[in-house]
Structure formats: structure tokens, C-alpha cells
Swiss-Prot record:
PROSITE patterns: TOPO_IA_1, TOPO_IA_2, TOPRIM. GO terms for biological process: DNA recombination; DNA repair; DNA topological change; double-strand break repair via homologous recombination; mitotic sister chromatid cohesion; reciprocal meiotic recombination; regulation of DNA recombination; telomere maintenance via recombination. This is DNA topoisomerase 3. It holds the Pfam family Toprim.
């Protein structure tokens, strides 16, 4: 019996073939230099009679095998009215490399009895699996539904891969239809509005250095003119968040405020403690002055202790790691942009160091053996000449026997509220020694993943919080302090700050306290800071713009399109909109479409429709028809208001 297995990337095909073939696979050329065919024998497929030994060929694609586009001859740039593209037929297309990969799949499928898909286990992976199946059928029409299986896996640990081969499922056609829906809508909306915007703004921008140079790469782009103003259903809401912050800063009007502050000497250590006014601050100077003078006249420099609290407090360990948290925290802590961190995580996954990095799940299944993963972090790396990671001793301490003095023992991670039912949270699979073949960025991302995982498997940090409340005449002031008693997870997770503060004065209830200093102070409200990538990731995730796996791509695209640029200020990197980016957002706002392109609502509704398709509550045909009709209506209104876009561009350019 012959089985053809196809992975999404050659690195996965190579790793899986080594495991299933017991290290005895042989490789041969596929016709495309970056894809190999791996041949081996394997027994254990459930469809093989009595678990018989099967001849297996493992190969791969390189991402999507096909694309869709309009016919260049009839619907290329300038060859048709733009609005015709809302109804124009779509053709399946392949570039030269995809054709070579497709030929290999057809050739290998000719003698195959079964096809097993080993693409990534997400929505996009299901669609790529379907593309593979369609190509395999062209090589062997006998490969129908019953002959197609789908391996379900989330990392490249040996036993996990063997279980995936022995317990396959079927392709999820609902997910396939959802991705097909998204691809068609993005193409029709993207090309129609890209051509309209480009033709409208081309003359304005022809000599501007602010234009992107990738027109030939963008579907629907004009190969003869790189001055393309592209539209994307996710990129515009992403741009909208950045422009909104920019305008809040630009239009900010500072306000002066006033407040009262007390300082009390701490006789135990010779220091001082500052007590903050419970009213915070007020914007009326006369009111604050009245409170201040009343207190001085009534109580002088004496306050009274009216409340004294001391209670245990906890700093919770982090929840298990999702894709969004990985990108957000790598941007915040490691100064890596979302694309850098996700690309590094992908490579670590392909090399077998971490689990699949595209997941919304923040809950580990209770049946999962996490202690064995902690043990691997504690082990010496045999390939690294006895080298240990900086956190190996911490991992070992989590596994110490119960009768040791260490209170920080292994504890099953907290459970979040998300479970995509496809992949567990991101976690390390094997330890990474000093000599591992990884880049510096990959090593930093691995360290973050490993430390985050160990923090999840640790005890919460424990401390004692104290609050001291004083009455100064009719006004109340308070000071708080913290003593950290057990650091626990903080010892392995340096990005969480929780430190012991200055000791509060030791005072008794109702005691009278001499005030060393009582001041009425002034301050000024400050504008928000420019948008950071970490903040943008959180906003996109909260508002349903893109998926955990595509957020990085959308942020990258608005910079490639030159709608946004990154600026480094000190250690922080901020995102600032360009003149073109601001004018596009304000231009569409001035046109007044029913659903603003720069707001998240329209794309969020589309993501909800795609989810309904995945759940079987909506069909591809209905969703495509409904959303394309909306875009058709918006296109006609935009086309009728083209001059508005030009006027807004001039206005924005003059103001910046």
C-alpha cells in the first residue's frame, strides 16, 4: 500500500519523515529546489489492513499552492470598467514555483492509495490541504473523500507525531469554505478600491517620495506604474487606530490641575512617606486652595490615623501563552516587531523547539504531561558540551521533592477563557543549548517562550500589602506599601515587576501624626504617547481585526504601503502615520460611508461571518454575495466623491 503525505513546508516534511521512518528515510528531488521527497516505510496507519507496513512518500508545498485572480486579458488594469470586477469570473492561478510543486504532487499521487495532509492545523492549513487534494486528484482520480486523511498535530515531538499518524481526522470543509470566502472578498474589494484610489490620487502623488514601490506585487496592480495606493480590508482599520491616536495627540489641549500632598517622617528608618490626597486632583485652583487653607486652619500640622490595614496579597503568574500575547510581549519586552517575533517562532516550531505558534488557546488540557516538559528545561543539553540554559536550575527547583524547604513547586498552570480546540498554548518542546542552530532573534524568542512556560508552572508570588490612611481636618490622605515574601515565578520571569516598597511608618490606630510638609501642588495633563506596536496588537485583537496569525502581516503591510512609519525614541519605537495615511482615513470619513473603512466594525462583522461558516451557520455563497454588495455600494459612493479625497489630501498635507 502506498501513502502520499504532504506537509505545508519542507522543514516539517523532513522532520516528520525522520520520526515516522525511524531515521531511515531517503530523499530525492521533487523538481523544485526547496522541496524534497522523502521515502520510508511505516506501519500504524488506521486505514492499513492489520496495521500493515506501508510505502510512504512525504513531500510538501511552500504555503498556498494556488491563488485566484481576474483574467489579465479581459480584466487587467485599464481593460475594463472597475465596477465590473465585483462580478467578473475568477481564475485559479499558479506562479512558476507553484507549478513545479503541483507537478510533483500529481506525479507522486499517481500510484498512491491514500493521501494524508500534514499542513498546519488552522483555518489556512485546511485550505492549503484542500488545494493539495485537488492537485492530487488531477494526478489520480481515485483519490476521493474516503482516501483523504488529515494529521492533527501541534509540535514535532516524536510521540506526538506518531499519535497524529495513527489517529488522523478528515479535512474540515467548513474551514476551507471560510478561507475561500475571505480570499474572494479580499480580492474583489482590494482590487476595485486599489484601482479607484490609485487612479484618483496618482497625479497628486506621482512626484511624492511617500508612495510605495510594490505595485507590481499587489494583485490588481499596474505593472507599468509603481504608484499604487492599495486598499485592504484589514489594513485600513489597522491604519485607523494609528491615525486616531495621532489626532488625539495633535488635538490635545493641556489643562492645569492642583492637588494636596502630605509628607510624614518615618522615625524607624529616618526616611519619609508621601501621602496622596484621596480626591486625586481638581481642575479648580480656588477649590483646592479652599480645602488646603481649611485643613491648615483647622488641624495645623497634625493628622490622625483613621485606618490601618495589612493583608496578604498575590501577584498572579501569567496565563498560558497565545499568539497575540507572544507578539505583544515580544514587542514590549524584547523590542521585536510582530512580524519578527512570529517569524522567529515559526522557525523554532519548524526546527522542533516549540509548539505550533499560531493559537488562541490560553488553557492547557489537564491530561497533558507538563512535568516532562519542565524536566526537559532542567536537563543538560547533551549536544552543547554540558551547557545549561540560564533558567535550567529554576526548572529543576520546580521538580524538587515535597519535603524540601523550597515552597515554589510545580503547579498546574492557570486556565484562561479561550480554547480554539486546535492547539495548546505555545510552549517549549525540547531545551535549546548554546550550540543549537538558531539565529539570535530565534534564541531570544525561545527564551521568552521557555521562561513564560516555567512561570505558568510556578507558584504565584506572595506578599503583604499595607495601607495607612490619615485624616487631616476634613480631608483624607493615604499611603500604601508592599513587602514581597515569596518571589516564586518572578525569579524566572524578569519582565513582571513586583518589588518591596519603602517601609511605612509604624503607627497605631487613632494616633496623632506630625506632618513634616503639607503642600498644594500644580500639574498639567499630558497627551497620550504615540502608538506602540504592542498597543496596536492589543487593539486589533480586541476589535477582531485579522486573526492571531495575521495581525503581524497587517501591521507590516501598512508600513510597506508607506501609510505608517516607525520612529525610535529612546528605547521605545512608535508608529506614526504619514501624510498619505492620514489623508486616506480622513478622506473616507469625509465621504461618509455607512460603515467607516477606518473603523474596525466592518472587518469584525466579516470575521464573525467567517466564523459562522466554520460553525455551519452560514454558507460561502450567501456571505460573499452580502459583503460584495456592500462594497459595490461603497465603491459607487466613493467614485462619486473622488474630489473629496483630493481636497482632503491637500488639506492634510498643508497641516502636516
Amino acid at each position: 500500500m502506498k501513502v502520499l503525505c504532504v506537509a505545508e513546508k519542507n522543514s516539517i516534511a523532513k522532520a516528520v519523515s525522520q520520526i515516522l521512518g525511524g531515521g531511515r528515510s531517503t530523499s530525492r528531488d521533487s523538481g523544485y529546489m526547496y522541496v524534497k521527497n522523502y521515502d520510508f516505510m511505516f506501519s500504524g496507519f488506521p486505514f492499513a489492513r492489520n496495521g500493515a507496513n506501508c510505502e510512504v512518500t512525504m513531500t510538501s508545498v511552500a504555503g498556498h499552492l494556488t491563488g485566484i485572480d481576474f483574467s489579465h486579458d479581459s480584466h487587467g488594469w485599464g481593460k475594463c470598467a472597475i465596477q465590473e470586477l465585483f462580478d467578473a469570473p475568477l481564475n485559479e492561478i499558479m506562479n512558476n514555483n507553484q507549478k513545479k510543486i503541483a507537478s510533483n504532487i500529481k506525479r507522486e499521487a499517481r500510484n498512491a492509495d491514500y493521501l494524508m495532509i500534514w499542513t498546519d492545523c488552522d483555518r489556512e492549513g485546511e485550505y492549503i490541504g484542500w488545494e493539495i487534494w485537488q492537485e492530487a486528484k488531477r494526478g489520480n482520480r481515485l483519490i476521493q473523500n474516503d482516501q483523504v486523511y488529515r494529521a492533527v498535530f501541534s509540535h514535532l515531538e516524536r510521540q506526538h507525531i506518531l499519535n497524529a499518524a495513527r489517529n488522523p481526522s478528515r479535512l474540515d470543509m467548513k474551514s476551507v469554505h471560510a478561507v475561500g470566502t475571505r480570499i474572494e472578498i479580499d480580492l474583489r474589494a482590494g482590487v476595485t478600491f486599489t484601482r479607484l484610489l490609485t487612479e484618483t490620487l496618482r497625479n497628486k502623488l506621482r512626484n511624492q517620495a511617500t508612495m510605495t514601490k510594490d505595485g507590481a506585487k499587489h494583485r490588481g496592480g499596474n505593472k507599468n506604474d509603481s504608484q499604487v495606493v492599495s486598499y485592504g480590508t484589514c489594513q485600513f482599520p489597522t491604519l485607523g487606530f494609528v491615525v486616531d491616536r495621532f489626532e488625539r495627540i495633535r488635538n490635545f489641549v493641556p489643562e492645569e490641575f492642583w492637588y494636596i500632598q502630605l509628607v510624614v517622617e518615618n522615625k524607624d528608618n529616618g526616611g519619609t512617606t508621601t501621602f496622596q490626597w484621596d480626591r486625586g486632583h481638581l481642575f479648580d485652583r480656588l477649590s483646592v486652595l479652599t480645602f488646603y487653607e481649611t485643613c491648615i486652619e483647622t488641624a495645623g500640622n497634625v493628622a490622625q490615623v483613621v485606618d490601618l490595614k495589612s493583608k496578604p496579597t498575590t501577584k498572579y503568574r501569567p496565563l498560558p501563552l497565545t499568539t497575540v500575547e507572544l507578539q505583544k510581549n515580544c514587542a514590549r519586552y524584547l523590542r521585536l516587531n510582530a512580524k519578527q517575533s512570529l517569524d522567529a517562532a515559526e522557525k523554532l516550531y519548524q526546527k522542533g523547539f516549540i509548539s505550533y505558534p499560531r493559537t488562541e488557546t490560553d488553557t492547557f488540557p489537564h491530561a497533558m504531561d507538563l512535568k516532562s516538559l519542565v524536566e526537559k528545561q532542567a536537563q543538560l543539553d547533551q549536544l552543547a558540551a554540558g551547557g545549561r540554559t540560564a533558567w535550567a536550575s529554576y526548572a529543576a527547583s520546580l521538580l524538587q521533592p515535597e519535603n524540601t524547604s523550597n515552597n515554589n513547586k510545580f503547579k498546574f498552570p492557570r486556565s484562561g477563557s479561550h480554547d480554539d480546540k486546535a492547539h495548546p498554548p505555545i510552549h517549549p518542546i525540547v531545551s535549546l543549548g548554546p550550540e543549537a542552530n538558531v539565529s539570535p532573534v530565534e534564541r531570544r524568542v525561545y527564551e521568552y517562550v521557555a521562561r513564560h512556560f516555567l512561570a505558568c508552572c510556578s507558584e504565584d508570588a506572595k506578599g503583604q500589602s499595607m495601607t495607612l490612611v490619615l485624616d487631616w481636618a476634613v480631608e483624607r490622605f493615604s499611603a500604601s506599601g508592599l513587602v514581597v515574601l515569596e518571589r516564586n515565578f518572578l525569579d524566572v520571569y524578569p519582565w513582571a515587576r513586583w518589588e518591596t516598597t519603602k517601609q511605612l511608618p509604624r503607627l497605631e490606630m487613632n494616633a496623632l501624626v506630625d506632618i513634616a510638609k503639607a503642600e498644594m501642588k500644580a500639574g498639567t495633563t499630558a497627551p497620550p504617547k504615540p502608538m506602540t506596536e504592542s498597543e496596536l496588537i492589543l487593539l486589533m485583537d480586541t476589535n477582531g481585526i485579522g486573526t492571531d496569525a495575521t495581525i503581524a502581516e497587517h501591521i507590516d503591510k501598512i508600513q510597506v504601503r508607506n501609510y505608517v512609519r516607525s520612529e525610535k525614541v529612546g528605547k521605545e519605537t512608535y508608529l506614526q502615520p504619514t501624510t498619505l495615511g492620514v489623508s486616506l482615513v480622513h478622506g473616507f470619513e469625509a465621504i461618509g460611508l455607512e460603515d467607516s473603512f477606518a473603523k474596525p466594525f466592518q472587518r469584525r462583522e466579516m470575521e464573525q461571518d467567517l466564523k459562522k461558516i466554520c460553525e455551519g451557520h452560514a454558507s460561502k455563497t450567501d456571505v460573499v454575495k452580502d459583503i460584495v454588495e456592500k462594497y459595490r455600494k461603497y465603491w459607487h459612493k466613493t467614485n462619486a466623491c473622488k474630489n473629496t479625497l483630493l481636497q482632503v489630501y491637500d488639506r492634510v498635507k498643508a497641516s502636516m
